Amino acid sequence: MYPVPTVIEQSSRGERAYDIYSRLLKDRIIMLSGPIEDNMANAIIAQLLFLDAQDSGKDIYLYINSPGGVVTAGLAIYDTMNFIKSDVQTIVMGMAASMASVLASSGTKGKRFALPNSEILIHQPSGGAQGQQTEIEIVAEEILKTRKKINQILADNSGQSVEKLNHDTERDNYLSAQEAKDYGLIDDIMENNKLK
């Protein structure tokens, strides 16, 4: 694991050392990086709730660089983003794949961004099953329900039809930042801290 950098700040009361993520949190920045799983989701949710309770009138900035991950963990973040009063700006840097693409597109409308060389990947959910035929059938039905739910969210976020999403997520569908903007998954491309 990569060591977490420490930032030292001077104040009238002396020095204070923060890990970089705690320092960014002071500026209402949350980093969603790496695979989405329950522990990561709980940390992201806690930060969203904390920042919203602190000042629900200010935006929260969610930076995303993730290959995706567990759908239920991602949907917990998605539900929290929609539950809180604060606007959530999403900024894709690097990759927002699979469940991360759902979160990237779920930021507050007009405040969904990507950096110029970012990629967004949309596809159908994957999963596996073993055991008796009835158990495999139950898992297959659950994957189909999940696909329907995810495609509905992506359709709502992008303005595309569910039918188009069903077709476009049949296989891995990689989108550049510009293609993601044209598709409606993001609103703008951010370059040099400006919108393109």
UniProtKB/Swiss-Prot annotation:
Record's GO cellular component terms? cytoplasm; endopeptidase Clp complex
How is the quaternary structure described? Answer: Fourteen ClpP subunits assemble into 2 heptameric rings which stack back to back to give a disk-like structure with a central cavity, resembling the structure of eukaryotic proteasomes.
Q: Report the catalytic activity.
A: Hydrolysis of proteins to small peptides in the presence of ATP and magnesium. alpha-casein is the usual test substrate. In the absence of ATP, only oligopeptides shorter than five residues are hydrolyzed (such as succinyl-Leu-Tyr-|-NHMec, and Leu-Tyr-Leu-|-Tyr-Trp, in which cleavage of the -Tyr-|-Leu- and -Tyr-|-Trp bonds also occurs)
Family per UniProt? Belongs to the peptidase S14 family.
Q: Does the keyword Transferase apply?
A: no
Reported EC number(s) for this entry are 3.4.21.92
| UniProt-listed InterPro entries | ClpP (IPR001907), ClpP/crotonase-like_dom_sf (IPR029045), ClpP/TepA (IPR023562), ClpP_His_AS (IPR033135), ClpP_Ser_AS (IPR018215)
List the keywords (alphabetical): Cytoplasm, Hydrolase, Protease, Serine protease
Q: GO:BP terms for this protein?
A: protein quality control for misfolded or incompletely synthesized proteins
At the top of the EC hierarchy, this enzyme's class is hydrolase
Where can this protein be found?
A: Cytoplasm
- Give the protein's recorded name: ATP-dependent Clp protease proteolytic subunit
* Organism of provenance: Lactiplantibacillus plantarum (strain ATCC BAA-793 / NCIMB 8826 / WCFS1)
PANTHER family linked to this entry: ATP-DEPENDENT CLP PROTEASE PROTEOLYTIC SUBUNIT (PTHR10381:SF70)
Xref: NCBIfam families: clpP, PRK00277.1, PRK12553.1
Q: Which gene encodes it?
A: clpP
Location of the active site: 98 (nucleophile), 123
Instruction: Enumerate the Pfam families for this protein.
Output: CLP_protease
Its annotated function is as follows:
Cleaves peptides in various proteins in a process that requires ATP hydrolysis. Has a chymotrypsin-like activity. Plays a major role in the degradation of misfolded proteins.
Molecular functions (GO terms): ATP-dependent peptidase activity; ATPase binding; serine-type endopeptidase activity
